[in-house]
């Protein structure tokens, strides 16, 4: 057998009382893997049993080790009746299958029950012995590493970025099987959890096989999603970017061949952070200029990649030579030829990365998106999911064709999502069309002369802004000017992108969160009629969302959006759209014009006075925003910049060559043109409401900033004080006769009040910034709106001078104080710094109510996780430790960022991908919807932290709550919630601890810059 799994059950504690007569429990444990089950002895009359079982050994294939989870069930022994279930623990074995990962899983795991929540803890030790397997026909992919982070992980360098990998598996949903009518809710929930865990493991294994076929060893930007299609079935799908990664182990590796010798890198060569100041506080993301392009989905028949001649990656004749002038033409042609050779063999040249190694991105062409409305049908054969594959293939082919139309050969920042209601499913995909540097895509394909030309032809701070297409044959009408930085090539007047801001970008002032919110009512319908109505609404919703983004961007006095994420959610009676992005002012782009309001009835005196008043308010708002975000661009004469192009005659020529729909051209005409001001024409009530909504967005309170990217543009002086939080708000619409205007007002108020409540609760942390703000909107029931927000609050030093125009700054100040956290109105995060006397209170805003729901006090749970750590006890600074070892941290930190400010990640232990179901039949007794969700999310955090601590980790980075599906039945006092979370388990070391170690150890024995060879 290629693998032997060994499990030992040590002890349990804080078990619930199962025998009312004695107020004790007769507990035993069943250990199951695959079809084999072992049992421990019954430990009589104790709430803290000590089993100390023998080693249970499972001899299995490595394929099963990847697919199957280890199931540990704790039961109460009953002599005369069936044994009562206390709870279960699912342990993923995959992290033990990496050669450089953990060798043992050991710790206290919360015992989870889908009805009662956490019911005590169990101490388990798991080991795996793998045998060498040289079978060329094997179906396992052991050794392929998975990372949730959408950038090259710390401690690694990218040798080759192979490209896009995807897979999906389907099955019947146990919740909708006939047997569900006769089994208990607990059995149904556990069957669902078990099936999803199996499908998740199978999906990961299949993607790993594809990576091995591409000769890679890792998947970066791994995104797994669950499509709950009801009676149609259950779909688990995932996308990612296949890479070949090398572990950095020596200082010499910090100057790779793929980085410019003149570029000083404090971190890893292809790390997201070439900036020494932000090496732990921000990833590097060379971004390219983007012109926003919404495109409603069209229907394509599935074809093989070899037959897609119309979607070839070869740009149109002349495309790519105009903007570079006489010098850039031959260079761009050579670059495209080299890059195309590396990509032409790939069916979909997509990357799920949003942050990139320095020099990978050459140009960005625009945001490309596609949507399609489908009718769900029952999955007849789970082993052959051709229908769903064909759906996604159509979407990807359309994205590919849009990128080609923009003169680009790749799509970066690519993501996919679905929205399902009854029988209708909306498939959505979006990304950023880009031109990539070929040396990252294939080994040995780029000659040295081309590498030199690439570095010479990319101006620092503005190269990504230059248009990749021919200015005389543009794919859409646009207003171009010469770059305000290098003054050699053309840039657009506005830039939209789905990726993060590059560290070398020259930004004026600070950034801010910009959101566009939209609701549209629709009639109730069934099947095809419903799908048709949704299809007809989608283009208009996309147009209005785009218009809102443009208006709000200009109202802020900014000219670029990064991290754009658009959601279209479908319900029974409405459609909702939510777009989030981070607005910035790029110095390379022209100063945005103002907003001018024009009315339809100029003879009406009172109406003109009203218009004039609104115009004054808008002008005042723009001036205040420029002052608030410190936007003071340097003045540049018009003679140095050049006149805008194209001229009207050239524009008519490009319109004739335009192959896209006339609707898209009209949409872009509204946002581009040779006018100093952006004109808003008020011709009806809806237009008036749009203008009012622009003015009702209140700025954040003094000392607060917010963004949906990892790093707030314009701020570099981060401290080590972070607080992650999740907030879920469910609102039931009261009125049955809502109009679109009233619905929009309610939705805007819901989102604004949610942000205001966060600012209020975090008021003692000022000055701080809410980073990686992730809004998710769903319509679980008719007239029910659910908004979920995940973000992290990071403090910064307001006394340190901000350096916004240089990508490389001095080392940022680091602070490990927890004083502000003690002053919080409520505990936000169950995490602490390395100071044992001052632990953080409880886990997030959610562990506060976990005391009465989980059976374990929050204080005890904090101690539980601390003792579960496999790294020992005590203060790291006061004990002797080997160089570059990981510190002892009392509680596992959680953050949606790919880094931890003021610290270095030394080791990745594996991916955490967990799915939980919680159901209750006593909703009111548990505090209603708020109390139920509050306790459940707290329990999810506790279980995630326990699994990370058992692996020997002390943090979860790139954390994301991908799904939070809530359903309630108030009349029956019932509720159910499904949550899917994922992230990367890591070991990190504080920079202050590294300094202590470097002072105690000889320089030859400890390399702080390597931070990370921990041998196991």
Curated annotation (Swiss-Prot):
It holds the Pfam family YbjQ_2. Ca(2+) 1 binds at residues 19, 26, 76, 78. Phosphorylated on Ser-197 by active myristoylated kinase AKT2; insulin-stimulated phosphorylation by AKT2 regulates SLC2A4/GLUT4 translocation into the plasma membrane. Its main location: membrane. Residues 319-328 have a biased composition (Gly residues). It is found in: Cytoplasmic vesicle membrane; Cytoplasm, Cell cortex; Cell membrane; Cell projection, Ruffle. GO terms for molecular function: calcium ion binding; calcium-dependent phospholipid binding. The modification Phosphoserine is found at residues 197, 200, 260, 293, 295, 304-306, 323, 643, 657, 659, 661-662, 671, 817, 869. Expressed in liver, muscle and fat. SMART domains: C2. Residues 274-289 have a biased composition (Polar residues). One of its GO terms (cellular component) is ruffle membrane. Keywords: Calcium, Cell membrane, Cell projection, Cytoplasm, Cytoplasmic vesicle, Lipid-binding, Membrane, Metal-binding, Phosphoprotein, Protein transport, Transport. Ca(2+) 2 binds at residues 19, 76, 78, 84. Residues 290-318 have a biased composition (Low complexity). PANTHER family: C2 DOMAIN-CONTAINING PROTEIN 5 (PTHR37412:SF2). Required for insulin-stimulated glucose transport and glucose transporter SLC2A4/GLUT4 translocation from intracellular glucose storage vesicle (GSV) to the plasma membrane (PM) in adipocytes. Binds phospholipid membranes in a calcium-dependent manner and is necessary for the optimal membrane fusion between SLC2A4/GLUT4 GSV and the PM. This is C2 domain-containing protein 5. It comes from Mus musculus. The lineage of its organism: Eukaryota, Metazoa, Chordata, Craniata, Vertebrata.
